Amino acid sequence: MSDRECDVCGKEFTKKAGLLKHKQRKNPCKAPVRLIEATVHQTLVDAGVPHLEVPTTEFREVSKKFNSSMSKELRKEQGIFFTPKKVRDVLFEKLAECGVNPKVILEPSFGSGEFLLDAKRLYPEATLYGVEKNEELFASTQCPEANLVCCDFLDWKGKADLIIGNPPYFVLKTDHLSAKEKKVFASKNAEAMTGRPNIFILFLYKCLTEHLEEDGYLAFIIPTSLYNCSYYQPMRNYIQKHTTIKYVETLDKPGFYETGQDTMLIVLQKGKRNNDYIFQSASGNIYISPHYKELYDITKGTRTLADLGLGAKTGNVVWNQVKEHLAEEGTLLIYSSNINHSELKIDNLCGKERKQYVKDMKKPTLSGPLILVERGYGNSFSFNSVLVELEEFYAENHINVIYPKTEEAAENLNVVMRSFQDERSQKFVKWFIGNGSISATDLETIIPIF
């Protein structure tokens, strides 16, 4: 080890002064997973206890074999995506930094057992429980030290002081939910979410409310839609009131087996201690972000659309539900693809079935001046907008429409367009949006106007 390398975390510095500052910081570093692994491994060897091998690749063979034998469609349908070692390591490192030493560990959807095997290696004295619904995965998992159950996690009962894993994520069909699940996940006053119920929210809510011991830790890999999706506002409210967020990070896309999903790491401790990683808007809405401090700083002293007398709503035409009205001429229908860097590009359509005009539509038309903003499709988000002064047109549902609530407020549309082109607006959107789209409510009440 060099004289400029930290003897705890292994980080190397170019100057001794940097190392000294690192050691004297308020929150001292702790041993990362690779050092914990080595310590546990050596302890077991010294004691003559059989030990588990430390994996040297991102996925164990059982994960690779199962992934190659299962169709992409089925994996997507059941939300089965295995977690690479480098991602698992980060979660375990963060738990180590928190001083977690669990007695009982639960993985609620253990898949091929990657997390269970890591947990057994890192916490050899802990009791392990694993639940898996898929019978093939259950049969293939090689972790005899764990108490494994093949069942639907929604039916499982038990307690743990550490819950860890990568729960499935896919949209549930409401007609498949039980009466209890509909109350929690599909009702207007849902305790966990509104709108379309996603299985990962169901797992998260059940773990926090039924299984996690007081002061216990939950460490999950879940979609970034938890950051700001309006459907999950109740879940964020619960997290803010009943837990402490210890760590949040957005993951880079590569690593998972074809998930096509932006994901995040989150570590929660049951019990309220502080508001780290929480961004609360002036209207009281709760959001989660690794950039919460930057969001507070950038919005300080700014106004919103609502402050300027402007409102926002979503376009009222779903094009594939009005195919019989699509035409080569008639009333203009503006799609999100028509919005291109503050300009309206007519005939810039995606897909052969779409047409730029509609006929015989009974829906009310829009009339300018209005600002049209691309709402997003749930992937990467581009903050595109255009000022439109046409007298009669429609906007599809992937567009948010900014409108003046009074004649006097119409003058502020130009102020908003200038603000949207400010680089600070792009920064805010990058830090704030986790699900690849922005709601009309967020546009009206949160996006800062510079």
Predicted regions and their residues:
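Glycine- and acidic
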Residues: 72-77, 189-190, 396-403
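Conserved residues in the N-terminal Rossmann fold of short-chain dehydrogenase/reductase
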Residues: 150
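C-terminal recognition-helix end and immediately following basic linker
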Residues: 1-8, 12-36
